[in-house]
Amino acid sequence: MGRRRCLMVMSVFPLLAGLTAAQTLGKEKVPPITQVNVQVPGPQRIGPLPPVDSPPGSPTSSLKIHLGKELYFDPCLSADNTVSCASCHNPALGWSDSGPTSSGIHGQLGGRRSPPVSNAAYNPLQFWDGRASSLEEQAKGPIQNPIEMGNTHKAMIKTVANIRGYASEFKAVYGEGPITVQQVADAIAAFERTVVTTDSLFDRFVRGDRQALTALEKKGLEIFNGKGHCTACHWGPNFSDGRFHNLGVPAKDPKNPDVGRYAITKNPRDMGAFKTPTVRDAALRPPYLHDGSERSLESLIDFYNRGGGKDPNLDPLMVPLGLSQHEKKALVAFIKALNSLNPEVADVKPIAPDHLRK
C-alpha cells in the first residue's frame, strides 16, 4: 500500500467559510469553523453520494428491483429455508446484524462481522477481503457457503424455478429460458444498488443547511477531517477509500489468525489487512471491526485513539491520536449525524414472498 502521508490538502466545503462565529457548547466554546481542509489522496472529498449507475449490459428496471428485493428477503435461497440475505444484512440493524460475527445455517457462526449492504454499490470490491469484484459476484457467494446458506447453486435454482410466482417474474424480467444463478445474482444486485443512504444531517449541512449540525457535531466534523486522521482512510462520498488496512486487531485464535486480504493477493503487505467500511450509518450497526470486537462507537474510537493494536504489519497510518474526552464525544456525535434519514433506506420493510407460492 505504501505511505500516503504526502496527500493533497484541499477545501471540502466552501459553505463552511460563512461559519465564522464561535459556537458555544455548554460552558465550553467551540472554535469557529472557517474552512475545513481535508488531507485526501487525489481529487476526492467527503460529501453527498453521487447516483448509482447500472453495470454495462445489465440495465435496471422496477420489475428487476422488485424481484431482487423478493429474493433478498426469501430464505428459500438457503438449503433448509431458514436463512435469507436479510438474516445477516438486516435493514433494521443498519443493513448488517447485531452479532460480532454472522450466523448462518444450523446456527453456525462465521469468522467475520457482516458488512453492510447499504452503499455497497460504491465499493470497488466486495467482502472484507475484497474477493468479489461486483455485487453480482458477491451475491452468489453466500448461497453455496457451507456456513451461511449451505446450498448449491443448482439446488437453489431448482427451488426458485419450482415456485410459480418466481417463474413468471423471471420471465417478465429476463424473457424466455431457464432461470440461472446469474439472473438471481443480477436481480439481487439491482435491489442492493437502491440501498443508498442519500440523506443525513451531514448531507443536509453540505447542501447548505447550516443549522443541520449542532455545535458538537460540527466540532466532530472538524476532528474527523483533522486531528482524528479519519479521512486518511474514510474519504470520498461514501467515507471509505475502498482499500485494505491492517489495524492491529488482535487475532481471536493466534494459532490460526484471519489473514484478511492476504488470502486473496498473497502479497505480504496485505497480511491482516481488511477493507475500510463506510462510516455512513455506522452508529446503527454495532459492534465494529471485521471481527466485531469493539462493542460501541466509544470503544472503537478509543481503539483508534490508542493507535490501534500491535502487529508487525500495522498500517503506518495507525498512530496515537491524543484525543480528549470532549473530542471523542464530538467525534461520536458527528458519526451519528451520518445516519440516513431517508425512510426508503432506513425503514425498508421486509417482503414475505409467500404470495409467490400461491
Predicted regions and their residues:
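Sec-dependent N-terminal signal peptides
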Residues: 8-14
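Periplasmic c-type cytochrome electron-transfer domains
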Residues: 2-7, 19-358
